[in-house]
Amino acid sequence: MGRRSRGRRLQQQQRPEDAEDGAEGGGKRGEAGWEGGYPEIVKENKLFEHYYQELKIVPEGEWGQFMDALREPLPATLRITGYKSHAKEILHCLKNKYFKELEDLEVDGQKVEVPQPLSWYPEELAWHTNLSRKILRKSPHLEKFHQFLVSETESGNISRQEAVSMIPPLLLNVRPHHKILDMCAAPGSKTTQLIEMLHADMNVPFPEGFVIANDVDNKRCYLLVHQAKRLSSPCIMVVNHDASSIPRLQIDVDGRKEILFYDRILCDVPCSGDGTMRKNIDVWKKWTTLNSLQLHGLQLRIATRGAEQLAEGGRMVYSTCSLNPIEDEAVIASLLEKSEGALELADVSNELPGLKWMPGITQWKVMTKDGQWFTDWDAVPHSRHTQIRPTMFPPKDPEKLQAMHLERCLRILPHHQNTGGFFVAVLVKKSSMPWNKRQPKLQGKSAETRESTQLSPADLTEGKPTDPSKLESPSFTGTGDTEIAHATEDLENNGSKKDGVCGPPPSKKMKLFGFKEDPFVFIPEDDPLFPPIEKFYALDPSFPRMNLLTRTTEGKKRQLYMVSKELRNVLLNNSEKMKVINTGIKVWCRNNSGEEFDCAFRLAQEGIYTLYPFINSRIITVSMEDVKILLTQENPFFRKLSSETYSQAKDLAKGSIVLKYEPDSANPDALQCPIVLCGWRGKASIRTFVPKNERLHYLRMMGLEVLGEKKKEGVILTNESAASTGQPDNDVTEGQRAGEPNSPDAEEANSPDVTAGCDPAGVHPPR
């Protein structure tokens, strides 16, 4: 197995953050849940204690506190999505309702700690508590709070995320115009933070920046897609590559092809994860120094690749959930040394006031798994050279070491603020990397060939094939080395010498990937599909129709998606280089009966906040009481709504509509954030097409208590809340009472186009 393949395997295996909180033992799962079968793991590891005491990463006199903290369960933390206009309303709801109910509450004799804000996270948008998932699930006193967390998490308004993992995105200092690469993104909690920062201004539907989120594990990429979809952004692309050889992309700039350099790069590399001992209990028995020794090379390759793709003046954050200097300072020191001044560590000591951290260390030793220590490379016997590398040791030259300013690195210790262990370093790029300084400018096709065939010395030194004669197999399908494949194709197309190449015949293209996703097909300007949509919704002339795409090349287009202009540029110029898993948000869905209503496509709730600024018709302004009725009843008659809403609805033809609630600043008791909903104007009624969890979110924000049971009539309210809105009758639906057994409402609800994301809140559609 080659080094690159081994690296991919290590990236997939070393994922400590996936462990369930508090999973301390194994066993068989019965009706009552996971039950015993294995002895509980003893939270002791003498080698671990010996190693870190010798390295002195913990201040003198604090070792006992450090170990005690590691043996305690990790507090639960949650983060409120900051870019959404509803963030203040959620925070108000949490502080004044749910948190107050937790005061003086005890569960199994343990006093429940009222959640407290993280002192260093801006605007009180992150909170922590001693409530574990186990307690939240089993305690009836916490049922409402648990349902709130589950529902709001699914809606994208709240994220369950470990406190220390929130730090790297904050230190990236992202602005809406930044091009961002997240190199090892799954499961996606940090990625969602980056998306939030791009959309800091909710009035701008398409910020200039974007996030390309990459992960080496194909299955985990779909977890990443699920996380990103909760935020409904047109500026996120999920790709599947080996981070250590992620392809260099190109973009079109005024008709010329130029290399894409990123303004911000998050390099949260795979690690041994000994900082996660509080939640990943297996680390106690499995920890050895061998894990760090094996991962060091991969971490350095990923960091180097990130530095190559960083724009001058850009910022890269390198982070691990490990306390080991072999994975931390050693990687940074080696990267700084090989950069020859192109990179420098930024001083971020004042950027997160309230965060407690220890400065990076400048001296460390290397220990083998059997406890043998080495202070420098010269002392390592030849038999150990495959396991221990010279880059694992600190630089010998004291002046060079001092110039690196390794003390600017941040190491977070668990006992200082009741968190996990973590390491962060912020790097700024001052100039091109030494091996990239003579990079040719790209001009047309010949320049593409030159760029693709000139690989960096980093590729050479890390044992990667750099010319076609070194490719091992005609069916090479590596998940990241697409530059090599591109170079091979160019050489073949140009008739260059190919002696010794074990490749396909010249008439065939090299296979880049093992399999392909559905294509991303942009809708051409002259497509007859768009004019009826444009007319029906009176779209603004500024609407970027060129950014619409579908996922099929044949048959009827059932879903229309949208990406930002910048991501469109990336997609069009790199379709053969990238393995794209997902991008874009759904904005329109085909309605089977749409032709009867002048437009075959209805609006999708997923993309309504992106689309709404461009829509000039089919908009009904509703009151807060109207919103309550629309979200708690399936097909309320016009007469159940306010007279203002009725007068607007009666003048509209049947079909898809936008329902807009504007807050009333004169009424402080009313909901103070705007709401935009997708709906359908039927013959005599209106219905909404809003996912269940999103419905529950809006109802909670309006002060309605929602229960979690699924009943035939849909969302169930408490008696007190139901009295304020009126319950729908249980015997027949509104559509049947209106004499519409085959109404468009019913056909729409039963249409196969109605996906889970657009389905009303778990209700049975009218038949």
From Swiss-Prot:
Describe, as the record does, how this protein assembles with itself and its partners.
Answer: Interacts with NPM1 and NCL during interphase; interaction is disrupted following phosphorylation at Ser-139.
Q: Which SUPFAM superfamilies match?
A: S-adenosyl-L-methionine-dependent methyltransferases (SSF53335)
The catalytic activity, as recorded, is: cytidine(48) in tRNA + S-adenosyl-L-methionine = 5-methylcytidine(48) in tRNA + S-adenosyl-L-homocysteine + H(+); cytidine(49) in tRNA + S-adenosyl-L-methionine = 5-methylcytidine(49) in tRNA + S-adenosyl-L-homocysteine + H(+); cytidine(50) in tRNA + S-adenosyl-L-methionine = 5-methylcytidine(50) in tRNA + S-adenosyl-L-homocysteine + H(+); cytidine(34) in tRNA precursor + S-adenosyl-L-methionine = 5-methylcytidine(34) in tRNA precursor + S-adenosyl-L-homocysteine + H(+)
The effect of residue 679 to R is: In MRT5; impairs proper intracellular localization
Q: Name one GO biological process term.
A: tRNA modification
On modification after translation, the UniProt record reads: Phosphorylated at Ser-139 by AURKB during mitosis, leading to abolish methyltransferase activity and the interaction with NPM1.
Organism field: Homo sapiens (Human)
A molecular function (GO) term: tRNA (cytidine-5-)-methyltransferase activity
Stretch forming the signal peptide: none
Query: What positions does the entry give for S-adenosyl-L-methionine binding?
Result: 184-190, 215, 242, 268
Name the family. Answer: Belongs to the class I-like SAM-binding methyltransferase superfamily. RsmB/NOP family. TRM4 subfamily.
Q: What is the effect of changing residue 271 to A?
A: Abolished mRNA methyltransferase activity
Enzyme Commission code(s) on record: 2.1.1.-, 2.1.1.203
Q: Please give the name of this protein.
A: RNA cytosine C(5)-methyltransferase NSUN2
Q: Where in the cell is it found?
A: Nucleus, Nucleolus; Cytoplasm; Mitochondrion; Cytoplasm, Cytoskeleton, Spindle
Tell me which residues this entry annotates as catalytic. Answer: 321 (nucleophile)
